Design a protein with these regions (language model features):
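Short, polar loop motifs at secondary-structure junctions
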Residues: 46-53, 84-88, 151-152
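Extended catalytic core of nucleotide-activated donor transferases of GT-like folds
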Residues: 27-33, 56-122
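Short, hydrophobic beta-strand segments that form beta-sheet elements in well-ordered domains
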Residues: 41-47, 79-82, 146-148
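Nucleotide donor/acceptor-binding cores
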Residues: 13-14, 97, 202-205
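N-terminal pre-catalytic "stem/leader" segment of glycosyltransferase-like enzymes
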Residues: 1-69
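Alpha-helical membrane-targeting segments
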Residues: 1-14, 67-68, 72-76, 121-142
Length: 223
């Protein structure tokens, strides 16, 4: 039904919709500011009341992604920006849009088509894993643009998403750029202390565990 609707509903020339599985943030938030600065109409599609509250606090237009309005906005948007998957916006109305996948990390480990968990079949049926891999690859082909932080990352993303060289462009990536062009050490420490209190001269350690191939994320260390 969604596919039929997107064939009939004309897409706007200047409407962009944004969404992220983790709320108002990620690379989509950085691109939001660029789009708005260039005069594009932008709407953030929310998945929870917390997201809606965050959008309201930021003073930006928003709509629930699972609502009729969320469907309509996604179906009308010329550009759809996501960070995880089509479910970041209204998944039933993305067909035909210029889909920008910003992703949400650096592929230090295997992901997508390169990770066994992607096509892990819930039942031991012959050919099911292959069918799941095919379905995943077909879904990813809707992506029109996927920015990469470097040429090394570009190659890994091409393999993981099954996309050609023309779809993945080395432009830099907001989540990564901040590490090289972000605040100084003293500024970063000040931000930490504003959250946790004074750390005096203590050494600070960043604990950033990677994705566990579909398993539960590791807990915060206690020692």
């Amino acid at each position: 039904l969604g596919l039929v609707a997107t064939r009939l509903i004309p897409r706007s020339k200047d409407l962009w919709v944004f969404g992220s599985a983790v709320g108002v943030g990620e690379g989509a938030w950085a691109l939001w500011h660029v789009a708005v600065a260039h005069g594009e109409r932008a709407v953030w599609l929310t998945g929870s009341q917390r997201d809606a509250d965050a959008a309201r606090s930021a003073g930006i237009r928003s709509a629930p992604k699972r609502s009729l309005r969320g469907f309509w906005l996604t179906a009308r948007a010329r550009v759809v920006v996501i960070t995880h998957g089509a479910g970041d916006v209204n998944r039933y109305a993305t067909s035909g849009a210029f889909l920008v996948q910003l992703w949400h990390g650096i592929p230090l480990k295997r992901l997508g088509l390169d990770s066994p968990v992607t096509a892990r079949a819930p039942l031991p049926l012959p050919g099911l894993a292959r069918l799941l891999a095919y379905a995943y690859a077909r879904t990813q082909r809707r992506i029109r643009l996927l920015p990469a932080a470097s040429h090394l990352v570009r190659g890994r993303l091409e393999s993981a998403f099954g996309l050609g060289h023309d779809r993945i462009v080395v432009t830099g990536e907001p989540r990564v750029d901040v590490l090289s062009a972000g605040p100084t050490e003293s500024e970063a420490r000040a931000v930490v202390e504003s959250l946790v209190g004074s750390v005096a001269g203590a050494r600070l350690v960043l604990y950033a565990p990677t994705w566990r191939d579909g398993d539960r994320d590791p807990a915060v260390p206690t020692a």
